[in-house]
Amino acid sequence: ASQPLTRSTLVRDANPFAAFMQSRQFMTALFAILFTVTALQNLGYTAYDQCFNYFIKDQFGFTSAYNGAIKGVIGFISLVANATICMSIIRRGKVNRSVAYVLMACTLTIFAVLFLDEMRVPFLIVNVVFYAFNAVSIPLLQDMVAKKAEGNDSNLVMGFYNATKSLGGIIGSLTAGFLYAKGASLSFVFAGIVLLLATLFAFVYQRKNAPSPLSARR
């Protein structure tokens, strides 16, 4: 029989930090590394995306309609990338080996943008590539977390995953606003550094999660 709802139960369930407090039930070193990657990925992406529209409007003088058209193209290409590249990686079972390289591609495109901020067409093309790779990274990371979650703790694990994404988004939005006020490109620099850290942690996770030679032979 289900337990009756009480005030304490409602307060506990509504607590946005409940997922963090419950993480001690399942947290391991590998989980900590993986969740660091997911938090950094969302932090970097949010910081970048928050300032992208303002940047192309302020620096290139694009209208709102033009900005909307650009976002539409980016959304379509991201959808195609998810339906092709992402699904191919998942079907082949190479998610752990691929996600670090996908994040590396995101990082490289962001740093490339810093050298193209005065050239409209190359700037937009590289941004489309960034958004496409970022769109691929999200379901790959979610797949990694879902496969790592086991048994009765699976709901807690996925709840913690969503909490880390939300935390990254909140910090990314706040940081992007402060940095953009200081300099138009600073949020891009910050996003690039954060995604570089996400890439490094992804490689660490890949190495630590790799099967041992003995288990691979079996």
Label every model-predicted segment.
Residues 1-34:
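Juxtamembrane intracellular "pre-TM" segments in multi-pass secondary transporters
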Residues 50-67:
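Short amphipathic helix-loop junctions that connect adjacent transmembrane helices
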Residues 54, 139-148:
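Intracellular helix-loop hinge segments at the cytoplasmic ends of transmembrane helices
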Residues 81-95, 180:
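Helix-to-loop junctions at the C-terminal end of transmembrane segments
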Residues 96-141:
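C-terminal transmembrane helical hairpin of 12-TM major facilitator-type secondary transporters
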Residues 151-181:
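A late C-terminal transmembrane helix in Major Facilitator Superfamily
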Residues 178-196:
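A membrane-interface helix-boundary motif in multi-pass transporters
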Residues 191-218:
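Multi-pass alpha-helical transporter architecture, strongest
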